[in-house]
């Protein structure tokens, strides 16, 4: 087994074939991409899967270029065994098969210092999705002893509490957990 170049997501089996797999960023599970004759072919499969899952922010083995249609693809020095479109469709099917939930997401508490907001931030899986704020609370500029230590004005705090009560009936379990995290952080002294 001679490793002339190590590729991300690629390993060589004892008998010489190359395999590729990728870890799903939100599900924290490995997705099997297949067995290949060369390390380069396995690396191209990894790159296509990374682009499908992470979009233009993907860490790839080969340079990524924009096509005329506006989609990302890996710059291919050698002709691949499959066309980029058919490879993309195959990998997309494998990724869908590995995900029981079609819209997995990562939700976390985040502080936006640029616009003085604290809130719940969510990133859904997929190359075409972008991170969004689920809920934001505006932090006040003046620190008030009667308000929360983070500087929420009492008026903003009352408005937020009223909105929370109205929306509480329709909030999912994941969102409810995120709201509790915000509440604990705001009430923490």
From Swiss-Prot:
SUPFAM superfamilies: DNA-binding domain (SSF54171)
Species in which this protein is naturally found: Arabidopsis thaliana
Function: Promotes cuticle formation by inducing the expression of enzymes involved in wax biosynthesis. Probably acts as a transcriptional activator. Binds to the GCC-box pathogenesis-related promoter element. May be involved in the regulation of gene expression by stress factors and by components of stress signal transduction pathways.
GO BP terms, alphabetized: ethylene-activated signaling pathway
Gene: SHN2
Protein name per UniProt: Ethylene-responsive transcription factor SHINE 2
PANTHER family tied to this protein: ETHYLENE-RESPONSIVE TRANSCRIPTION FACTOR SHINE 2 (PTHR31194:SF12), SHN SHINE , DNA BINDING / TRANSCRIPTION FACTOR (PTHR31194)
Tissue distribution: In flowers.
SMART domains: AP2 (SM00380)
Keyword Transit peptide: no
Molecular function in Gene Ontology: DNA binding; DNA-binding transcription factor activity
């Amino acid at each position: 087994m001679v490793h002339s170049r190590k590729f991300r997501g690629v390993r060589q089996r004892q008998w010489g074939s190359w395999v590729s797999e990728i870890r799903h960023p939100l599900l924290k599970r490995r997705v099997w991409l297949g067995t290949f004759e060369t390390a380069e072919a396995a690396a191209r499969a990894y790159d296509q899967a990374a682009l499908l899952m992470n979009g233009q922010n993907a860490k790839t083995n080969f340079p990524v270029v924009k096509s005329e249609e506006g989609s990302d693809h890996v710059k291919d020095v050698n002709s691949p065994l499959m066309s980029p479109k058919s490879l993309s469709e195959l990998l997309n099917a494998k990724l869908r098969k590995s995900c029981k939930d079609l819209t997995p997401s990562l939700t976390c508490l985040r502080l936006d210092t640029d616009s003085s907001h604290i809130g719940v931030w969510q990133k859904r899986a997929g190359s075409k999705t972008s991170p969004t704020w689920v809920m934001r609370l505006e932090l006040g500029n003046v620190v008030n002893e009667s308000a929360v230590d983070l500087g929420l004005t009492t008026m903003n705090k009352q408005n937020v509490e009223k909105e929370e009560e109205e929306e509480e009936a329709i909030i999912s379990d994941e969102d409810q957990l995120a709201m509790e995290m915000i509440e604990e952080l705001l009430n923490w002294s």
